[in-house]
């Protein structure tokens, strides 16, 4: 259902857009951090999410969430909600079978398929516009959103273009917050991203190279370099692992499904097999030296390669070594931190697998599959502990591991200091965004001949006007709701 607001004048409204389906714990950390910071800066802020899986993300973050896309593509799959939430009426099995056959036949006809896509897109655009009329700021909320690897040009690049155009038409401001640029290959992707970036009144990028790539798309994409939103995750404790002399060592290893033919959009099975062999060789060697190893993942595709890696590691191992090897699945960021706090050192490949390790006070070696991981390690002063996934050898990894173990205390202290600095920068960015939202709301009141009710705002949540749910297929219900807005220019000093 959509949420219709009657006479909402007492709180700003911000919509957080992300290609997040509730499974990737790095994206989950980003959204949790941003939500907490926005509420800290503006206690009366009303938030909603625009995601690939509204029901799941709404349940996880306790805000209402709406469908990001009308259609699904390979490696970019959205979900739709039922219009009324009712169960379908019982139908005879024969009728169900006939219905399914007719649907398959219809989808096989190009014209019918294109017509359905057009109708779905039109209806989704109308509902999205209705939502955005009640939003002050559409925030493109962190992560590697300038990218066409997952879903192609008609995946997220198109979604960004569509939502930013609709936001401006609805009178909302658009802000890109600490976004990253990854693979940008096709001309169509560049056109979609050029439109989206040009319509924003605030832009920040999580690293200098992302900013450079964005400026290569359009000179109007200028913005600040502001760290990844995950660095401001509240509730994290950067507590160094304290080991007594001779105590057993525990290591967390987070493999990645990079190149896997069935799990990664750009398949390179030969590279994937080579990666698993080298990683297995490293894990096998440290197990033989008495180290305990825990396999973990921060994204659903990666845990699907645990069995393959375990099989390779266990070849030639004695029973004692096998007993020190285990795998743990994490469904939430909190569970992931439990895993990280139980180990002393980490070997990971995903950006947020590495970043969250440092946030938990655990030094990490990165086996980098992408520029963003290499950039993160360099910014944290850990470039010597970063290996290229395409060329690393198990012996190289073993040498870096021993060096990391020897210098772990120094690394923990240095990285903790940098993380605190990043947290302060991110808090300033959130204050800027809430000020932008407040300006949009006040300008809307003045334009409509209304006055801003400070007394009502100070009365707190119980003094807010009521919110009426109305039917519509876009959203998963939760306790928060969205707001109204328009455009307002603002700047942010370069870090």
Task: Give each language-model segment a name.
Residues 1-458, 463, 468, 472-476, ...:
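Active-site anion-handling motifs in enzyme catalytic cores
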Residues 479, 484-486:
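Intrinsic disorder/low-complexity segments
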